[in-house]
Amino acid sequence: PMHAFDSRKVEKIRIKRFGTPFTFQTLDGVERNIDENTLMICNDNTPVAIAGIMGGLDSEIVDDTHTLTLESATFNAVSIRKSTVRLAHRTDASMRYEKCLDPEMTVPAIARFVKLMTDVDKDVKVVSSLTDEYAFHYDTVELDFDKAFVDKYTGIEIDNDTIIST
Protein backbone atom coordinates (compact mmCIF):
# COMPACT_ATOMS: atom_id res chain seq x y z
CA PRO A 1 0.00 0.00 0.00
CA MET A 2 0.94 3.59 -0.58
CA HIS A 3 -0.36 6.82 0.84
CA ALA A 4 -0.46 10.16 -0.94
CA PHE A 5 -0.35 13.43 0.99
CA ASP A 6 -0.96 17.01 -0.07
CA SER A 7 2.61 18.33 -0.47
CA ARG A 8 1.61 21.70 0.97
CA LYS A 9 1.05 19.91 4.27
CA VAL A 10 3.68 17.16 4.13
CA GLU A 11 7.17 18.09 2.98
CA LYS A 12 9.40 15.65 4.85
CA ILE A 13 8.28 12.23 6.03
CA ARG A 14 9.55 10.83 9.32
CA ILE A 15 8.40 7.65 11.03
CA LYS A 16 8.29 7.64 14.82
CA ARG A 17 6.51 6.78 18.02
CA PHE A 18 5.55 9.52 20.45
CA GLY A 19 6.42 9.16 24.13
CA THR A 20 3.00 10.25 25.34
CA PRO A 21 -0.58 9.48 24.27
CA PHE A 22 -2.50 12.00 22.15
CA THR A 23 -5.56 12.17 19.89
CA PHE A 24 -5.36 12.11 16.11
CA GLN A 25 -8.12 12.65 13.55
CA THR A 26 -8.05 10.14 10.69
CA LEU A 27 -9.38 10.55 7.15
CA ASP A 28 -12.77 9.17 8.20
CA GLY A 29 -13.17 12.11 10.61
CA VAL A 30 -12.82 10.02 13.78
CA GLU A 31 -10.64 11.21 16.69
CA ARG A 32 -8.45 8.25 17.67
CA ASN A 33 -6.54 7.77 20.90
CA ILE A 34 -2.92 7.13 19.98
CA ASP A 35 -0.71 5.50 22.61
CA GLU A 36 3.07 5.54 22.95
CA ASN A 37 3.43 2.25 21.01
CA THR A 38 1.62 3.33 17.85
CA LEU A 39 3.91 4.03 14.89
CA MET A 40 3.10 7.33 13.18
CA ILE A 41 4.01 8.92 9.85
CA CYS A 42 5.00 12.53 10.52
CA ASN A 43 5.78 15.72 8.66
CA ASP A 44 8.91 16.34 10.67
CA ASN A 45 7.34 16.11 14.17
CA THR A 46 3.66 16.60 13.27
CA PRO A 47 1.70 13.34 12.88
CA VAL A 48 0.01 12.99 9.48
CA ALA A 49 -0.92 9.27 9.40
CA ILE A 50 -1.14 6.15 11.53
CA ALA A 51 1.54 3.96 9.94
CA GLY A 52 0.03 1.12 7.96
CA ILE A 53 -3.53 1.94 8.98
CA MET A 54 -4.93 5.30 7.84
CA GLY A 55 -3.94 8.83 6.94
CA GLY A 56 -4.85 11.95 8.82
CA LEU A 57 -7.54 14.44 7.92
CA ASP A 58 -5.17 17.43 8.11
CA SER A 59 -2.96 16.18 5.25
CA GLU A 60 -5.61 14.74 2.94
CA ILE A 61 -5.73 15.43 -0.77
CA VAL A 62 -8.38 18.04 -1.57
CA ASP A 63 -9.83 19.52 -4.76
CA ASP A 64 -7.11 22.16 -5.10
CA THR A 65 -4.20 19.77 -4.43
CA HIS A 66 -1.69 19.99 -7.28
CA THR A 67 1.39 18.33 -5.78
CA LEU A 68 1.69 15.06 -3.88
CA THR A 69 4.10 13.53 -1.44
CA LEU A 70 4.01 9.74 -1.81
CA GLU A 71 4.85 7.27 0.91
CA SER A 72 5.37 3.64 -0.06
CA ALA A 73 6.50 1.54 2.86
CA THR A 74 6.40 -1.76 4.65
CA PHE A 75 6.00 -1.99 8.38
CA ASN A 76 6.42 -4.73 10.95
CA ALA A 77 3.29 -6.88 10.65
CA VAL A 78 3.03 -7.53 14.39
CA SER A 79 3.31 -3.82 15.19
CA ILE A 80 0.54 -2.96 12.71
CA ARG A 81 -1.70 -5.74 14.02
CA LYS A 82 -1.26 -4.59 17.62
CA SER A 83 -2.05 -0.98 16.68
CA THR A 84 -5.11 -2.12 14.73
CA VAL A 85 -6.41 -4.03 17.76
CA ARG A 86 -5.65 -1.17 20.19
CA LEU A 87 -7.44 1.31 17.94
CA ALA A 88 -10.25 -1.12 17.06
CA HIS A 89 -9.83 0.08 13.49
CA ARG A 90 -9.02 -2.46 10.77
CA THR A 91 -8.55 -1.09 7.27
CA ASP A 92 -7.68 -2.45 3.85
CA ALA A 93 -4.15 -1.14 4.34
CA SER A 94 -3.72 -2.72 7.78
CA MET A 95 -4.95 -6.09 6.49
CA ARG A 96 -2.29 -5.98 3.77
CA TYR A 97 0.49 -4.93 6.17
CA GLU A 98 -0.46 -7.72 8.57
CA LYS A 99 0.52 -10.19 5.84
CA CYS A 100 4.22 -9.22 5.85
CA LEU A 101 4.57 -7.35 2.56
CA ASP A 102 7.76 -7.64 0.54
CA PRO A 103 9.90 -4.55 1.25
CA GLU A 104 11.47 -4.90 -2.20
CA MET A 105 8.17 -3.78 -3.76
CA THR A 106 8.04 -0.24 -2.32
CA VAL A 107 10.14 1.40 -5.03
CA PRO A 108 8.45 -0.44 -7.95
CA ALA A 109 5.08 0.57 -6.45
CA ILE A 110 5.98 4.25 -6.69
CA ALA A 111 7.24 3.75 -10.25
CA ARG A 112 3.95 2.07 -11.16
CA PHE A 113 1.96 4.92 -9.57
CA VAL A 114 3.92 7.50 -11.56
CA LYS A 115 3.37 5.54 -14.78
CA LEU A 116 -0.37 5.31 -14.18
CA MET A 117 -0.52 9.03 -13.43
CA THR A 118 1.38 9.91 -16.62
CA ASP A 119 -0.91 7.59 -18.62
CA VAL A 120 -3.85 9.68 -17.40
CA ASP A 121 -2.16 13.08 -17.68
CA LYS A 122 0.96 13.55 -19.82
CA ASP A 123 1.78 16.79 -17.94
CA VAL A 124 2.42 14.98 -14.63
CA LYS A 125 6.01 15.57 -13.50
CA VAL A 126 8.18 14.03 -10.80
CA VAL A 127 9.81 17.02 -9.14
CA SER A 128 11.85 15.39 -6.40
CA SER A 129 14.12 12.44 -5.91
CA LEU A 130 13.20 9.15 -4.33
CA THR A 131 14.38 8.51 -0.80
CA ASP A 132 14.68 4.85 0.14
CA GLU A 133 15.15 4.16 3.85
CA TYR A 134 15.59 0.42 3.95
CA ALA A 135 15.86 -0.75 7.54
CA PHE A 136 15.40 -4.46 6.88
CA HIS A 137 17.10 -6.71 4.37
CA TYR A 138 16.32 -10.31 3.62
CA ASP A 139 19.28 -12.67 3.51
CA THR A 140 20.11 -13.99 0.06
CA VAL A 141 19.06 -17.59 -0.29
CA GLU A 142 20.55 -19.92 -2.87
CA LEU A 143 18.54 -22.91 -3.99
CA ASP A 144 19.54 -25.97 -5.94
CA PHE A 145 17.56 -25.99 -9.16
CA ASP A 146 16.70 -28.91 -11.41
CA LYS A 147 15.54 -27.68 -14.83
CA ALA A 148 14.52 -31.20 -15.85
CA PHE A 149 12.12 -31.31 -12.89
CA VAL A 150 10.55 -27.99 -13.93
CA ASP A 151 10.11 -29.18 -17.51
CA LYS A 152 8.55 -32.45 -16.33
CA TYR A 153 6.35 -30.74 -13.73
CA THR A 154 5.00 -28.10 -16.15
CA GLY A 155 4.76 -30.44 -19.11
CA ILE A 156 6.63 -28.01 -21.35
CA GLU A 157 10.25 -27.15 -21.91
CA ILE A 158 11.03 -23.66 -20.64
CA ASP A 159 14.21 -22.02 -21.91
CA ASN A 160 16.87 -20.98 -19.39
CA ASP A 161 16.54 -17.23 -20.08
CA THR A 162 12.82 -17.31 -19.26
CA ILE A 163 13.48 -19.20 -16.03
CA ILE A 164 16.24 -16.80 -14.97
CA SER A 165 14.18 -13.70 -15.73
CA THR A 166 11.20 -14.89 -13.72
In which residue ranges do the predicted regions lie?
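RNA/tRNA-interacting regions in translation and RNA-turnover enzymes
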Residues: 1-166
